[in-house]
């Protein structure tokens, strides 16, 4: 009975917006990290690799900034806007995914969600980066399959920049 009481005392209620949907009155263990919590809610695109913040597979956007969900407690996300790979704008993500496929930047798929989240953040920053800057920005995402060259090519692909800028402009007009 003492274990049940301890378990109850270590839980709290939080609310957040995940992929533009309100999630209110969610019960969470105070020591559970955001990555596990998101997966429990059904957001399986957030992969958990090292669970130490090194591999980048668990990247999500918290209030539009990239965060390692294995290093953030779910309670720290209370009141925040969370975007997982499933919540990225589908038309924009199709362009990014097409660039990854075209440049052979996807292999086993384990790092893909983290890479796509980082790529999305890079491209949406409204700035064109050099290859070295791209390498630096994706350096926090481990990929054991591609050797990174193809990923840099995909991120740098002018098609992604051109189409995302056009899509953004159309959205701003409407």
Question: Which residues does each predicted region cover?
Answer:
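Signature of N-terminal electron-transfer/Fe-S-associated modules in redox systems
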Residues: 2-165
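Single conserved hydrophobic/aromatic residue that forms the stacking wall/gate
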Residues: 163-166, 170-174
